[in-house]
Amino acid sequence: MSDRLTLLRPDDWHIHLRDGAALPHTVADVARTFGRAIIMPNLVPPVRNAEQADAYRQRILAARPAGSRFEPLMVLYLTDRTQPEEIREAKASGFVHAAKLYPAGATTNSDSGVTSIDKILPAIEAMAEVGMPLLIHGEVTRGDVDVFDREKIFIDEHMRRVVELFPTLKVVFEHITTADAVQFVTEASANVGATITAHHLLYNRNHMLVGGIRPHFYCLPILKRNTHQVALLDAATSGNPKFFLGTDSAPHAQHAKEAACGCAGCYTAFAAIELYAEAFEQRNALDKLEGFASINGPRFYGLPANTDRITLVREDWTAPASLPFGELTVIPLRAGETLRWRLLEESK
């Protein structure tokens, strides 16, 4: 087994960079590895139109390390009031690549999200017409639904309907966490894809709850039982082009995670491709990592793959105990623990 792994430079098809003083840190981490990234729009206030997307894009570009060619791919935040014309303007901009459906209350800064899919059907129709992908956080948020069942019920109540109503629409089922989602995406048309995070491949709810509550494993959608983890690993390492890399790296300051009511999100951007390599190596599937990380995503979005390469070496190193996050601190996933793969920084 080789101790070196060279891949076409990957892209991250789902990441949270936050804003303001955090950007120099989060942008440096993502730009270290990835050529492009789909940038989540759930700021306060959210990114609702092309003008706001461009302003956020400029802030990200200004935060890139010197010499970086990292390209942020911007996303609109759908609300009950999103108009078809806003979709058309965003598509015409050339820098907005998708729009995101957050069910209201589903995750961080989603209070302005969609309360009923019926209210955004004209906007979704416009997306289908202009060829803009719809990214969906696939969870119901009703109080009578168990948090571990939110994704499955969303499929039955909403996802099937959207796909049937708009057969030409490209839909990304974001950060899937269940065998049910794997089956749905596998059986759907070629216009339906899904992102999978490193933390959902490496961990299940036992890691978060057994022996004590570990807040830095808490994310939404929440970690599920190990049978779902196995289904995700099967999908990611299958070679099926419908599944591709999306870290959902979502930093929160240490005090906001280690709290009586802690925030949801795992910070993985500092070592994302290294974490995915561990997951794929567990399945003896390192030969499938390039497709998942570097080819399937751009193909789904109709973009060319990157042409430069990165190299990973099998070499133990210790993840930092903490990282700067503006004037605050973020605790990364696997803080203080050993990682098995390391990115060669000088690789081109």
UniProtKB/Swiss-Prot annotation:
Catalytic activity entry: (S)-dihydroorotate + H2O = N-carbamoyl-L-aspartate + H(+)
Keyword field: Hydrolase, Metal-binding, Pyrimidine biosynthesis, Zinc
Pathways involved: Pyrimidine metabolism; UMP biosynthesis via de novo pathway; (S)-dihydroorotate from bicarbonate: step 3/3
Keyword Transmembrane helix: no
Swiss-Prot/TrEMBL GO biological process terms: 'de novo' pyrimidine nucleobase biosynthetic process; 'de novo' UMP biosynthetic process
Residues the entry annotates as binding Zn(2+) 1: H14, H16, K100, D248
Cofactor remark: Binds 2 Zn(2+) ions per subunit.
Cofactor: Zn(2+)
Residue numbers binding Zn(2+) 2: K100, H137, H175
One annotated Gene Ontology cellular component of this protein: cytosol
Entry EC no(s): 3.5.2.3
Annotated active site: D248
Entry binding sites for substrate: H16, L17, R18, N42, H137, L220, H252, A264
Pfam family, one: Amidohydro_1
PANTHER family named in the record: DIHYDROOROTASE
Assembly and binders: Homodimer.
Protein family membership: Belongs to the metallo-dependent hydrolases superfamily. DHOase family. Class II DHOase subfamily.
NCBIfam families: pyrC_dimer (TIGR00856)
Name of protein: Dihydroorotase
Species the sequence originates in: Pseudomonas fluorescens (strain SBW25)
Gene name linked to the record: pyrC
